Curated annotation (Swiss-Prot):
HAMAP family in UniProt: ClpX
GO biological process, one term: cell division
List of residues binding ATP: P122, T123, G124, C125, G126, K127, T128, Y129
Tree of life domain: Bacteria
Binding site for Zn(2+): C13, C16, C35, C38
Originating organism: Rhodococcus erythropolis (strain PR4 / NBRC 100887)
UniProt key word Nucleotide-binding: yes
Domain (ClpX-type ZB) ranges: 1-54
Protein name per the record: ATP-dependent Clp protease ATP-binding subunit ClpX
GO cellular component, one term: HslUV protease complex
Gene (UniProt): clpX
GO molecular function annotation: ATP binding; ATP hydrolysis activity; ATP-dependent protein folding chaperone; protein dimerization activity; unfolded protein binding; zinc ion binding
Length: 426
């Protein structure tokens, strides 16, 4: 037992040696003592170590080309969107490492502003999956929010602060780590105001939500209710700084192509105008030509667009891309279903014609890559029901007829082993 001499019975800290008179508190353990000052020091050391481990270190941060290469393993096509995202993410985390400030060539301090991203494109083309794959690569907290569930403060629905709660939960309530995470807000086109002109009546789920999102997009100290729901007095809040949170805002923006076409078409009048045939105009990716004025006409307010300086567009997937999505990425659907069948000791095979037929069906349904899984489930459901109860199946072959004509997949029976033959003849 740690004691001080001179006949006194004073206890002392086993770590710093201070007596119980020199400190506020002395906590006893089995044969050891620790003072309040040493406890504070231990807490500081732990917090520093946790903060260091949660930071994305610049020397470990992949370069834009490496980020794009990683995305290639999981996402087919969308090269322009991959490049835009790779550069935006690299610059964002480089800015965090610089502590929001850097020095230019003349040695002057320059404040580095945040560049959030707006993603445009049809449904089922990989917008959400691109963002999820990015977060997985960088090992940062990632949260997905639906803009349609949000309303202006004081009305029925979710407050914008609930988006931040999802990020904090994804970081296991480690606020420091959450402050360098990524938030993906989907369906943002659904919060466009209903007309181009500001309305006299309140638009609580449209323009009101855009106004409410402005502060957290730009960077602010937000108060988040720990259990979600509405804020009320006498409630404790989690404080989170959104300055270093990267926001990726996305939507299908149906009808925006027409607004862009009208603007581009007006430029094609008069002498010296660039004349394009109808066939050329049909093949042009209108989302790649989007300007802020088009988004304002669509119903986004100028302040909201100003906080989303980077625009990445994704295009409709053609048949070739859909076939590649089925078989080539690391988590391709064909590989996933093969693994499921493999667990039952059965081999699964798709003919090339079958993959083409599945891609054709997805194009007909207009659901993009998202519809591929639904078609695969429909095609494989009968055999996935039967196979677990049978032990005489070697292989299942899916053909084009299986997809187009609802014919059952071809079942190749398992060859009996020699021992089994002897038993039958005995």
């Amino acid at each position: 037992m740690a004691r001080i001499g001179d006949g006194g019975d004073l206890l002392k800290c086993s770590f710093c040696g201070k007596s119980q008179k020199q400190v506020k508190k002395l906590i006893a353990g089995p044969g050891v003592y620790i003072c309040d000052e040493c406890i504070d020091l231990c807490n500081e050391i732990i917090e520093e170590e946790l903060a260091e481990s949660s930071e994305v270190k610049l020397d470990e941060l992949p370069k834009p080309a490496e980020i794009r290469e990683f995305l290639e393993n999981y996402v087919i096509g969308q090269d322009s969107a991959k490049r835009t995202l790779a550069v935006a993410v690299y610059n964002h985390y480089k800015r965090i490492q610089a502590g929001d400030k850097g020095r230019d060539a003349r040695g002057e301090t320059v404040e580095l502003a945040k560049s959030n991203i707006l993603m445009l494109g049809p449904t089922g083309c990989g917008k959400t999956y691109l963002a999820q794959t990015l977060a997985k690569m960088l090992n940062v907290p990632f949260a997905i929010a639906d803009a349609t569930a949000l309303t202006e403060a004081g009305y029925v629905g979710e407050d914008v602060e609930n988006i931040l709660l999802k990020l904090i939960q994804a970081a296991d309530y480690d606020v420091k780590r959450a402050e360098t995470g990524i938030i993906y807000i989907d369906e943002v086109d659904k919060i466009a105001r209903k007309s181009e002109n500001p309305s006299i009546t309140r638009d609580v789920s449209g323009e009101g939500v855009q106004q409410a999102l402005l502060k957290i997009l730009e960077g602010t100290q937000a108060s988040v209710p720990p259990q979600g729901g509405r804020k009320h007095p006498h409630q404790e809040f989690i404080q989170i700084d959104t300055t270093n949170v990267l926001f990726i805002v996305a939507g299908a923006f149906a009808g925006l192509e027409r607004i862009v076409s009208d603007r581009v078409g007006k430029r094609g009048i008069g002498f010296g105008a660039e004349v394009r045939s109808k066939a050329e105009l049909d093949t042009v990716d209108r989302f790649a030509e989007v300007m802020p004025e088009d988004l304002i006409k669509f119903g986004l307010i100028p302040e909201f667009i100003g906080r989303l300086p980077m625009i990445a567009s994704v295009t409709n997937l053609d048949k070739e891309s859909l076939v590649q999505i089925l078989s080539e990425p690391k988590n391709a659907l064909v590989k996933q279903y093969r693994r499921l069948f493999d667990m039952d000791g059965v081999e699964l095979e798709f003919t090339e014609e079958a993959l083409d037929a599945i891609a054709d069906q997805a194009i007909l349904r207009g659901t993009g890559a998202r519809g591929l899984r639904a078609i695969m489930e429909e095609v494989l459901l009968p055999v996935m029901y039967d196979i677990p109860s049978r032990d005489d199946v070697e292989k299942v072959v899916v053909t084009a007829e299986t997809v187009n004509d609802n014919v059952l997949p071809t079942i190749v029976p398992r060859k009996p082993e020699r021992g089994e033959r002897r038993d039958k003849t005995a």
